[in-house]
Curated annotation (Swiss-Prot):
This is FAD assembly factor SdhE. The lineage of its organism: Bacteria, Pseudomonadati, Pseudomonadota, Gammaproteobacteria, Alteromonadales. Gene3D superfamilies: Flavinator of succinate dehydrogenase. It comes from the Bacteria. The keyword Lipid metabolism does not apply. The gene is sdhE. GO terms for cellular component: cytoplasm. An FAD assembly protein, which accelerates covalent attachment of the cofactor into other proteins. Plays an essential role in the assembly of succinate dehydrogenase (SDH, respiratory complex II), an enzyme complex that is a component of both the tricarboxylic acid cycle and the electron transport chain, and which couples the oxidation of succinate to fumarate with the reduction of ubiquinone (coenzyme Q) to ubiquinol. Required for flavinylation (covalent attachment of FAD) of the flavoprotein subunit SdhA of SDH and other flavinylated proteins as well.
């Protein structure tokens, strides 16, 4: 296997892992995260990709409150990612 094939396989594995992490206990979050990974994740900078992955470590009730506008995330990077996802994903 060439280095290019190895890189492609690693990207596919990472994308599959991300999509699995996007499957939440709340459908409202699933319909935001899964399309975002499919349509926008690859276009993000490495820093923003890490920020998105950090966002996925949050608890569902907290994430739901941020995305529904009930609360504002105090972490500026995470808040910017929430806003980007809301802008990119039309629900």
């Amino acid at each position: 296997m060439t280095n290019n094939e190895n890189s492609t396989n690693l990207l596919k594995v990472n994308k599959a892992r991300l999509k699995w992490a996007c499957r939440r206990g709340m459908l409202e979050l699933d319909v935001l995260f899964i399309p975002f990974v499919d349509e926008a994740y690859d276009e993000l900078s490495t820093k923003d990709q890490f920020t998105f992955e950090r966002l996925l470590t949050g608890q569902d009730p907290e994430l739901f409150a941020w995305f529904m506008g009930h609360e504002v995330c105090e972490d500026t990077e995470l808040n910017a990612m929430v806003q980007l996802i809301l802008k990119r994903v039309k629900v």
